[in-house]
């Protein structure tokens, strides 16, 4: 399939969501940017394998996820400030409560198993349907639903959130934890 203007525009429209997903996976904006760039290069190099009429964002997210997993396996042996002592010296004190709440949310999200975090980010934050998230992750729809449910339950417990409380500083956090946005 040739790269049409419409297809190019659709790919470019997916970049912000790809970057957000890459950041949620890697926890590092620079690595996320590298993942997105490599995803776009791979997608363009393999544009002939994209099936017209199928879900372009799901195809792109699948490429990104596979790249992340490959990169993760390579980096698993690297030690990069494992205890965070160096990073703590670089941090400045946040000036707003929302920033503190988001950091607390981010820390809780990082405690989730990788498969649950991926499912939750895809469904809760990126707005993919359970079916699309299952296609991206290469598993059954029921598996995605289970992962999302377990992730939401664990996040709620980690953040001491019950059904009556406000779910966080913004709509994305509320959608991820509460399932509505």
UniProtKB/Swiss-Prot annotation:
Coiled-coil ranges (or none): none
Keywords assigned by UniProt, alphabetized: DNA-binding, Sigma factor, Stress response, Transcription, Transcription regulation
A Gene Ontology biological process term: DNA-templated transcription initiation
Pfam families: Sigma70_r2 (PF04542), Sigma70_r4_2 (PF08281)
PROSITE patterns attached to this UniProt entry: SIGMA70_ECF (PS01063)
Annotated region described as Sigma-70 factor domain-4, given as residue ranges: 103-155
Transmembrane segments: none
InterPro entries reported in the protein's UniProt record: RNA_pol_sigma-70-like, RNA_pol_sigma-70_dom, RNA_pol_sigma70_ECF_CS, RNA_pol_sigma70_r2, RNA_pol_sigma70_r4_t2, RNA_pol_sigma_r2, RNA_pol_sigma_r3/r4-like, WH-like_DNA-bd_sf
Gene3D superfamilies reported for this sequence: 1.10.1740.10, Winged helix-like DNA-binding domain superfamily/Winged helix DNA-binding domain
One term of GO molecular function: sigma factor activity
Chain intervals for the UniProt region annotation (Sigma-70 factor domain-2): 15-77
Record remark on domains: The sigma-70 factor domain-2 mediates sequence-specific interaction with the -10 element in promoter DNA, and plays an important role in melting the double-stranded DNA and the formation of the transcription bubble. The sigma-70 factor domain-2 mediates interaction with the RNA polymerase subunits RpoB and RpoC.
Family as reported in the entry's similarity comment: Belongs to the sigma-70 factor family. ECF subfamily.
Purpose: Sigma factors are initiation factors that promote the attachment of RNA polymerase to specific initiation sites and are then released. Regulates expression of hpnP under a variety of stresses, including high temperature, pH stress, and presence of nonionic osmolytes.
Protein name from the UniProt record: ECF RNA polymerase sigma factor EcfG
Organism: Rhodopseudomonas palustris (strain TIE-1)
Gene: ecfG
